[in-house]
């Protein structure tokens, strides 16, 4: 008789966690960034100051999509800044903030699918015209959103119980 190979034993603990990827995409489609991340001076302000996100000018009512899957941390209104805003936590630990919205279509705790519509472009709060203010935060600190757009992030997949 031919020799029989011993059974193969799975050693998942050595293989590491199962992973998958998420991709951050532009929250407004078809419109360019008109105000970049970093120091800027607005015509209505005396001094330059840090701009902690990017602005994407688009017509009032243009759809805004989540940059990646995640869960809504909070929504609200900030009269002195963001106006109507949404903050989302993503599986890679980053958070995104969408400001100056004319309408919010999600609520705190909602789970979001990739590129799900979450609201509409507006000009609420401290704003000079319709646009989306978009921020990305890592460990609570703002990072340049253009550094994460169209970038793939590998995340661990939790085993099902």
Where do the PLM segments sit?
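Non-catalytic extracellular/periplasmic "stalk"
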Residues: 1-30, 160
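Catalytic cores of peptidoglycan-degrading enzymes
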Residues: 22-160
């Amino acid at each position: 008789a031919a020799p029989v190979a011993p059974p193969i034993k799975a050693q998942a603990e050595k293989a590491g966690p199962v992973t998958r990827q998420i991709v951050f995409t532009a929250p407004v489609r078809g419109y360019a960034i008109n105000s970049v991340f970093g120091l800027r001076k607005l015509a209505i302000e005396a001094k330059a100051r840090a701009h902690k996100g990017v602005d994407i000018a688009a017509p009032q009512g243009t759809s805004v999509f989540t940059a990646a899957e995640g869960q809504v941390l909070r929504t609200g209104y900030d009269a002195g800044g963001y106006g109507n805003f949404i903050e989302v936590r993503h599986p890679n630990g980053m958070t995104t903030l969408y400001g100056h919205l004319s309408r919010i279509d999600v609520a705190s705790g909602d789970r979001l699918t990739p590129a799900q519509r979450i609201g509409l472009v507006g000009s609420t709060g401290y704003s000079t015209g319709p646009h989306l203010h978009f921020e990305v935060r890592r460990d609570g600190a703002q990072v340049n959103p253009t550094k994460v757009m169209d970038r793939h992030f590998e995340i661990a997949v939790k085993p099902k119980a």
